[in-house]
């Protein structure tokens, strides 16, 4: 199963639409025909769930016929259409489109956890699972996060991690809602498992990490599947997924440090060289304000040219590691 795509599950979702007020989910369950994860190496798949049962859509009876259909052939297009609208919304505000990793990270970050809705037939524990993925697509929350990022009430950023770099910054929260931070990246192609069935070797090439630390130095770790106790998820060092989400469920008001780093060496384009990894960062919470931490990088080289300069300068740096 590919690392960088978005795998969509099919759920039977019942929505109550009142004459006034907001629609509400009154029932939902994964369709029996919807494929389940995880992958052989333990990655969280599917990624997201959409409504795909008894969906009114066009059919192949005539040129103009419609009918009810069921399957991921319904949930997949529904999710894809929502993602296109999110791209349009982002472009309207930023005059550019999101990277695929940003879009994927955003919808997984803002998904409605199936365990948090009492009307959903789900795994009775929070976090991702191999049936729903990260949960039901929540396009409203995703769109609001894009809006909130305009006023620094949320973070939706596209960044680059250099080999050996540790990127760290702090956020101040009021403590009135959950603090969540997600990174997602388009990973390089892994080793071909030619002729090997059910290989548990991680397909991940560049293993990025995200952590949240509070003022008492308590460290919060990302979700990962508990392969010894499926379908449940636990929090720990995730070495297989190219999306990681960390949560502080009941944050106290104050300052939290978010740190992004990586294991091993980020390979370059030529054998033996060192490279970079583009990644996307999404953070939501309450009344976020951000500041970069001091000394977030220790550098072995820092080059600036030309010198003297008139209008433009170039710079290049390398970390000590």
Region locations from a protein language model:
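Acidic glycine-/aspartate-rich tracts in secreted/extracellular proteins
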Residues: 12-15, 53, 112-115, 186-188, ...
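Short proline/glycine-enriched turn/loop motifs at strand-loop junctions of beta-rich domains
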Residues: 52, 185, 205, 318-321
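Catalytic-core environment of secreted peptidases
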Residues: 11-24, 30-77
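Hydrolase catalytic cores
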Residues: 49-119
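Surface-exposed, proline-anchored Ser/Thr-rich loop/turn motifs
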Residues: 295-320
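Secreted peptidase-domain scaffold signal
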Residues: 128-206, 214, 273-291
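Structural recognition of the beta-strand scaffold that forms the well-ordered cores
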Residues: 6-9, 46-50, 56-57, 75-76, ...
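C-terminal edge strands of extracellular/lumenal beta-sandwich accessory domains
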Residues: 102-104, 167-169, 198-204, 211-216, ...
């Amino acid at each position: 199963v590919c690392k960088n795509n978005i795998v969509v599950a099919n759920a039977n979702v019942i929505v109550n639409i009142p004459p006034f007020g907001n629609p509400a989910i009154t029932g939902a369950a994964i369709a029996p025909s919807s494929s389940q994860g995880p992958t052989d190496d333990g990655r969280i798949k599917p990624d997201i769930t959409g409504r795909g049962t008894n969906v009114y859509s066009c059919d192949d009876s005539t040129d103009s016929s419609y009918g009810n259909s069921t399957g991921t052939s319904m949930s997949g297009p529904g999710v894809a259409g929502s993602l296109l609208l999110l791209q349009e919304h982002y472009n309207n505000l930023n005059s550019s489109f999101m990277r695929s990793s940003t879009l994927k990270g955003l919808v997984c970050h803002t998904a409605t956890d199936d365990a948090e809705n009492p009307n959903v037939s789900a795994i009775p524990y929070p976090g991702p699972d191999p049936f729903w993925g990260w949960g039901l697509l929540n396009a409203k929350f995703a769109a609001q996060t894009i809006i909130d990022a305009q006023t620094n009430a949320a973070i939706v950023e596209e960044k680059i991690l250099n080999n050996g770099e540790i990127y760290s910054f702090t956020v101040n929260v009021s403590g009135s809602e959950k603090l969540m931070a997600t990174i997602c990246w388009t990973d390089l192609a892994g080793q071909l498992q030619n002729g090997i069935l059910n290989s548990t070797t991680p397909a991940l090439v560049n293993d990025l990490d995200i952590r949240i630390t509070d003022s008492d130095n308590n460290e919060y770790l990302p979700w990962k599947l508990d392969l010894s106790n499926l379908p449940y998820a636990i929090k720990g060092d995730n070495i297989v997924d190219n999306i990681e989400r960390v949560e502080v469920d009941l944050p106290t008001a104050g300052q939290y440090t978010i740190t992004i780093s990586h294991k091993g060496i980020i390979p370059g384009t030529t054998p033996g060289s060192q490279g970079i990894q583009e990644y996307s960062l999404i953070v939501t919470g309450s009344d976020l304000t951000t500041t970069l931490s001091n000394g977030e990088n220790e550098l072995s080289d820092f080059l600036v040219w030309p010198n003297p300069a008139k209008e433009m300068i170039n710079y290049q740096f390398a970390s000590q590691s």
